[in-house]
Amino acid sequence: MLLNIANSVGKRTIKFAQSVGSFSLFSFAAVSSIIRPPLYLSLIIRQLLFIGFHSLPVVAMTTFFSGAVLALQSYTGFSRFSAESSIATVVVLSLTRELGPVLAGLMVAGRVGASIAAEIATMRVTEQVDALYTLSTDPIKYLVFPRVIAAIITMPCLVLIGDIIGVMGGYLVGVYKLDFNSTAYLTSTFHYLEPIDVISGLVKAGVFGFIISIISCYSGYYSGKGAKGVGRATTSAVVNSSILILISNYLITELFFKV
């Protein structure tokens, strides 16, 4: 019994170590491909539209209602201590530091990450990736590089727009539902907001963009055979990206806001 448990743990440990090593080599190959021609500018532009522009409605809806709910819930709690004047500050700091980047990252991971993994996994199953080798084309440069660059560029843009829309959601609830004075609410919103709050969120967004793109590409590139392999690659991309987003969010927060 104990021997079987030890054997199972050993196999899982070795498999995990192999996965970490494989992912590290894949990430290094993707990053190092930046300095090698060609640039594939048309592919980058296509991915900028897919990852950025087409994800904007999802991110906008998520952040708008998150800001609105945050204002509503903050009022419910702060009114017990007569601290309603702090609601606007809580909304803007929560969105710019944490909720904006994390929610945008999770939404993009669900929408874009799944799509990237499924697309590359399908190409792997149908041997299109092998065909790139026969055409003397580096698959990582052709498939991974444009998606990684596009995700790193577009995620901060999405987060910045999402922050603005989320603050608008909180403003509309605060002014038109909770009867706050418009000028006082806006003054409170920007009084305690500092550049580091916005910068930390944008740095997180760039890191999240890299995480989503590289994990999704890796999951698709090394997918199993058949429809089951494509499904597992898609699930793995979304789950692993989401987990790493939350972990890296804590680490970056610790880096920027040391207590």
UniProtKB/Swiss-Prot annotation:
Annotated membrane topology is: Multi-pass membrane protein
Presence of the UniProt keyword Cell inner membrane in the record: yes
Q: Name one GO molecular function term.
A: phospholipid transporter activity
A GO CC annotation given for this chain: ATP-binding cassette (ABC) transporter complex
A Pfam match: MlaE
Supply the alphabetized keyword list. Cell inner membrane, Cell membrane, Membrane, Transmembrane, Transmembrane helix, Transport
List residues traversing the bilayer. 13-35, 49-69, 148-168, 195-215, 237-257
Top-rank lineage group of the source organism: Bacteria
Primary location class: membrane
Record localization:
Cell inner membrane
Read off the PANTHER family from this record: ABC TRANSPORTER PERMEASE PROTEIN-RELATED, PROTEIN TRIGALACTOSYLDIACYLGLYCEROL 1, CHLOROPLASTIC
Q: List, alphabetically, the NCBIfam families matched.
A: MlaE family lipid ABC transporter permease subunit
UniProt name for this protein: Probable ABC transporter permease protein RF_0080
Q: Which organism is it from?
A: Rickettsia felis (strain ATCC VR-1525 / URRWXCal2)
Lineage in the entry? Bacteria, Pseudomonadati, Pseudomonadota, Alphaproteobacteria, Rickettsiales
